[in-house]
Amino acid sequence: MLMPKRVQYRKTQRGRMKGNAQRGTAVTFGSFGLKALEPAWITSRQIEAARVAMNRYMKRDGKIWIRIFPDKPVTKKPAETRMGSGKGNPEFWVAVVKPGRIMFEAAGVPREIAQEAFRLAAKKLPIKTRFIVRPDYEG
């Protein structure tokens, strides 16, 4: 599962997801991409599940790029604990994804196979997505 090796602060504030993505909105590495249409926290488990689904369908042909990284720790207090007594311990890691962000890219496979692989990956994610083709793609 994806997570940072080291972090400056063990616990972070939740923050808010305002506006659209400013960076990572163009398909740059591959020929096809999966674009987020909604804001969300994507967990490292969801990223891994989507990656596995794509790899299985593509039968390890082509190449996949993961363009998001879970660098935000989400804390949780233990069950049946009273309120107060500090912030809970980090439980899992999330990537903050805003609308317009390219989350996954693929190359080296036909368009139909990439589209189906991204459809299977999108089922593993909690947001609406769209299949994107690089503008200069010659299929």
Swiss-Prot record:
One of its GO terms (molecular function) is tRNA binding. InterPro entries: Ribosomal_uL16 (IPR047873), Ribosomal_uL16_bact-type (IPR000114), Ribosomal_uL16_CS (IPR020798), Ribosomal_uL16_dom (IPR016180), Ribosomal_uL16_sf (IPR036920). Keywords: Ribonucleoprotein, Ribosomal protein, RNA-binding, rRNA-binding, tRNA-binding. GO terms for cellular component: cytosolic large ribosomal subunit. The keyword tRNA-binding applies. GO terms for biological process: translation. It comes from the Bacteria. This is Large ribosomal subunit protein uL16. It comes from Chlorobaculum parvum (strain DSM 263 / NCIMB 8327) (Chlorobium vibrioforme subsp. thiosulfatophilum). The gene is rplP.
